[in-house]
Amino acid sequence: MTKKVGIVDTTFARVDMASIAIKKLKELSPNIKIIRKTVPGIKDLPVACKKLLEEEGCDIVMALGMPGKAEKDKVCAHEASLGLMLAQLMTNKHIIEVFVHEDEAKDDKELDWLAKRRAEEHAENVYYLLFKPEYLTRMAGKGLRQGFEDAGPARE
């Protein structure tokens, strides 16, 4: 069964995370149709994601953004995150938030690596939510992280 996956990214981001996520999704399944939209900034993500769910019939959407280092960027990221949560509640569908804050990395090389890895790992989560949700259940409590190294379970 073919599933529709929406991908929304921003021109503000410094890495093309959408292309990375799309490539990974295509590797994982031939049964995924992808609809990509690009918006200017992170606060534009919620409405674009909601439109993909409601108007384009997407089963799930990835929201890819890269907040800057300034305090106002963190505020904007928080507002965008709240908007994404509201859009999920209004549509009863998942929007996977994939934010990479510029200050998470020590330099541009690490930022590029982190953005690509986080986009790929969240694309895998999208695949599992759509096609193999039981896998996610088996991974509960494992301390999995998207991007940097997994934390692992608190107790073995």
From Swiss-Prot:
GO terms for cellular component: riboflavin synthase complex. Keywords: Riboflavin biosynthesis, Transferase. Pathway: Cofactor biosynthesis; riboflavin biosynthesis; riboflavin from 2-hydroxy-3-oxobutyl phosphate and 5-amino-6-(D-ribitylamino)uracil: step 2/2. Its EC number is 2.5.1.9. It holds the Pfam family DMRL_synthase. One of its GO terms (biological process) is riboflavin biosynthetic process. InterPro entries: LS/RS, LS/RS_sf, Ribfl_synth_arc. It catalyses: 2 6,7-dimethyl-8-(1-D-ribityl)lumazine + H(+) = 5-amino-6-(D-ribitylamino)uracil + riboflavin. It comes from the Archaea. GO terms for molecular function: riboflavin synthase activity. Belongs to the DMRL synthase family. This is Riboflavin synthase. The gene is ribC.
